[in-house]
């Protein structure tokens, strides 16, 4: 039997420092990651520190609104 409601949803994480100061960088663009989260355990918006290839450092990536 399949469950009626899926608890895990697919989300997109976006770098918060790329869009602000991207004019002096080598490559234009915004770093994005896709992942899944459990809505029951994490009802708030997710923030993770991930590597951004455009900034060439580890930065905070925030969950995008759907």
Swiss-Prot record:
One of its GO terms (molecular function) is structural constituent of ribosome. One of its GO terms (biological process) is translation. The keyword Oxidoreductase does not apply. One of its GO terms (cellular component) is ribosome. It is found in: Plastid, Chloroplast. It comes from the Eukaryota. InterPro entries: Ribosomal_bL33, Ribosomal_bL33_CS, Ribosomal_bL33_sf, Ribosomal_zn-bd. The keyword Chaperone does not apply. Pfam families: Ribosomal_L33. SUPFAM superfamilies: Zn-binding ribosomal proteins. Keywords: Chloroplast, Plastid, Ribonucleoprotein, Ribosomal protein. Belongs to the bacterial ribosomal protein bL33 family. HAMAP family: Ribosomal_bL33 (MF_00294). This is Large ribosomal subunit protein bL33c. It comes from Angiopteris evecta (Mule's foot fern).
